[in-house]
From Swiss-Prot:
It is found in: Mitochondrion intermembrane space. One of its GO terms (molecular function) is metal ion binding. It comes from Rattus norvegicus (Rat). Electron carrier protein. The oxidized form of the cytochrome c heme group can accept an electron from the heme group of the cytochrome c1 subunit of cytochrome reductase. Cytochrome c then transfers this electron to the cytochrome oxidase complex, the final protein carrier in the mitochondrial electron-transport chain. Plays a role in apoptosis. Suppression of the anti-apoptotic members or activation of the pro-apoptotic members of the Bcl-2 family leads to altered mitochondrial membrane permeability resulting in release of cytochrome c into the cytosol. Binding of cytochrome c to Apaf-1 triggers the activation of caspase-9, which then accelerates apoptosis by activating other caspases. Found in embryos and in adult liver and heart. The modification N-acetylglycine is found at G2. This is Cytochrome c, somatic.
């Protein structure tokens, strides 16, 4: 598992412009990520997803996030997430460790 503190820095640098993680956090360009783990794609209440996200039908967890965060548009063709991805596996592991903690508090 990755390093939560390093993951928080990655989130602030690469994700926080479009996403929030706290319970009751607002949707921005991207959805609030609270409760992400164990939720199916395209299911955050009140966020307008593309059909690609709604129809992907996978459940978010460490393995699915590891693959998605490497190249979001390859994993879910048609997603409106414009982020290019994180190529370094260690950085993805750190981010996932942070998300696992932060989206569950």
């Amino acid at each position: 598992m990755g390093d939560v503190e390093k993951g928080k820095k990655i989130f602030v640098q690469k994700c926080a412009q479009c996403h929030t993680v706290e319970k009751g956090g607002k949707h921005k360009t991207g959805p609030n990520l609270h409760g992400l783990f164990g939720r199916k794609t395209g299911q955050a209440a009140g966020f307008s997803y593309t059909d690609a996200n709604k129809n992907k039908g996978i459940t978010w967890g460490e393995d699915t996030l590891m693959e998605y965060l490497e190249n979001p548009k390859k994993y879910i063709p048609g997603t409106k997430m414009i982020f290019a991805g994180i190529k370094k596996k260690g950085e993805r592991a750190d981010l996932i460790a942070y998300l696992k903690k932060a989206t569950n508090e």
